[in-house]
């Protein structure tokens, strides 16, 4: 099989590429240049990352190239990130990058050049079932599982995905293997921040691009309790950094409950008001057919949160998910991954949330 190995400059993608070679595949390494800026200390898009990827490819013994996807990344990921926050929503840029860059723009170019698959260092697994359907599953190591950010992938993409690390028990073993292979990235730290925000200060980064927008912070009773310089700097569930002018009447901590972009208002209130009993919105499927008939499943609303048992069904052309127990601090714009066991059924883009009246 002819494999294009996407090499970020980190240890996971380097070991994945090496394993692809070990399996006898014809492997070519490629680094995605996603930004023309030289800023940033950690991530996957700096010149240092490109150098690390090139060095790893040389050690493995495979050809290596750098492909420029900066324009697509700007439009599909960065501009989307800014517009979503401006609209009071909370996007996941890693998920958007997988959807539009790694497994769209990159995959299309790879297929056009005669490659059979794109190999990445993601911790997930793909199986071909008896019906010819490609199933996306969690990694063997749930601690490192990344199926949440891959839940947007569909059959045409999964058919060409190759995840050599999916069955690896732990990241420690990956680092150990990298060291044994002589890969200098074996001790390179993991990146947990948004790669295109060097300072890790999302609010300040957004403010530079959107501009200052003074507005009010109100409580759930409609009383003004503070002010802000940009509602885009807040997200649902946030507690720190609110700088409220008056304490809550009940003495309880207050959290961001909602962001109203039209009035440029941030609404705060008690944690119990963050409860969500129903999620709904547009969806994609990895190959599962959702219908109006409810199915038992589990839902995961964040990359590293625990899944919650739920039912899912179609209503008025949108996917509705009702967790068996409430989930908290779910923001519009977030994604929810839908599972049955370890299998990913699809992804819900959360457009609406609902809280049922207490019994």
Swiss-Prot record:
The keyword ATP-binding is annotated on this UniProt entry: yes
Key word ATP-binding present: yes
Catalysed reactions listed for this entry: S-sulfanyl-L-cysteinyl-[protein] + uridine(34) in tRNA + AH2 + ATP = 2-thiouridine(34) in tRNA + L-cysteinyl-[protein] + A + AMP + diphosphate + H(+)
Active site per database record: 97, 195
Gene Ontology CC terms, in alphabetical order: cytoplasm
Disulfide bonds: 97-195
Similarity comment: Belongs to the MnmA/TRMU family.
One Pfam entry name: tRNA_Me_trans_M
Annotated site residues (Interaction with tRNA) in this chain: 122, 334
Binding site for ATP: 6-13, 32, 121
UniProt-recorded Gene Ontology molecular function terms: ATP binding; tRNA binding; tRNA-uridine 2-sulfurtransferase activity
One Gene Ontology term from the biological process aspect of the record: tRNA wobble position uridine thiolation
Keyword terms: ATP-binding, Cytoplasm, Disulfide bond, Nucleotide-binding, RNA-binding, Transferase, tRNA processing, tRNA-binding
Listed name of the protein: tRNA-specific 2-thiouridylase MnmA
Residue span of region Interaction with tRNA: 144-146
Primary role: Catalyzes the 2-thiolation of uridine at the wobble position (U34) of tRNA, leading to the formation of s(2)U34.
Subcellular location as annotated: Cytoplasm
Enzyme Commission number(s) from the entry: 2.8.1.13
């Amino acid at each position: 099989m002819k494999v294009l190995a996407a090499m970020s400059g980190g240890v996971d993608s380097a070991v994945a590429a090496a394993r692809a070679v070990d399996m006898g595949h014809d492997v070519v390494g490629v680094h995605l240049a996603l930004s023309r800026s030289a800023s940033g200390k950690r991530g996957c898009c700096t010149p240092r990352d490109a150098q690390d990827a090139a060095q790893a490819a040389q050690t493995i013994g495979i050809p290596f190239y750098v492909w420029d996807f900066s324009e697509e990344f700007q439009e599909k990921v960065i501009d989307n990130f800014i517009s979503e926050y401006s609209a009071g929503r909370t996007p996941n840029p890693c998920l958007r990058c997988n959807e539009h860059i790694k497994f769209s723009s990159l995959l299309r170019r790879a297929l056009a050049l005669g490659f059979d698959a794109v190999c990445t260092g993601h911790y997930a697994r793909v199986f071909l079932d008896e019906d010819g359907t490609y199933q996306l599953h969690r990694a063997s190591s749930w601690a490192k599982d990344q199926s949440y950010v891959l839940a947007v992938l569909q059959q045409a993409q999964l058919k060409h995905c190759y995840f050599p690390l999916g069955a690896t028990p732990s990241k420690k073993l990956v680092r150990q293997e990298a060291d044994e292979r002589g890969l200098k990235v074996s001790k390179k730290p993991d990146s947990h921040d948004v790669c295109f925000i060097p300072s890790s200060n999302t609010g300040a980064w957004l403010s530079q691009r959107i501009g200052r927008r003074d507005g009010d912070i109100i409580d759930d009773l409609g009383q003004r309790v503070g002010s802000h310089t940009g509602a885009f700097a807040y997200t649902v569930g946030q507690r720190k950094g609110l700088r409220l002018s008056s304490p809550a009447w009940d003495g309880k901590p207050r959290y961001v409950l909602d962001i109203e972009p039209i009035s440029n208002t941030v609404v705060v209130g008690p944690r119990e008001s963050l409860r969500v009993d129903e999620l709904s919105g547009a969806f994609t499927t990895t190959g599962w057919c959702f219908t109006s008939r409810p199915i038992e499943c589990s839902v995961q609303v964040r990359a590293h949160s625990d899944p919650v048992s739920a039912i899912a069904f179609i209503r008025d052309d949108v996917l509705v998910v009702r967790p068996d127990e409430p989930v908290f601090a779910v923001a519009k714009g977030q994604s929810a991954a839908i599972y049955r066991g370890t299998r990913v059924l699809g992804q819900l883009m959360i457009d609406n949330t609902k809280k049922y009246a207490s019994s």
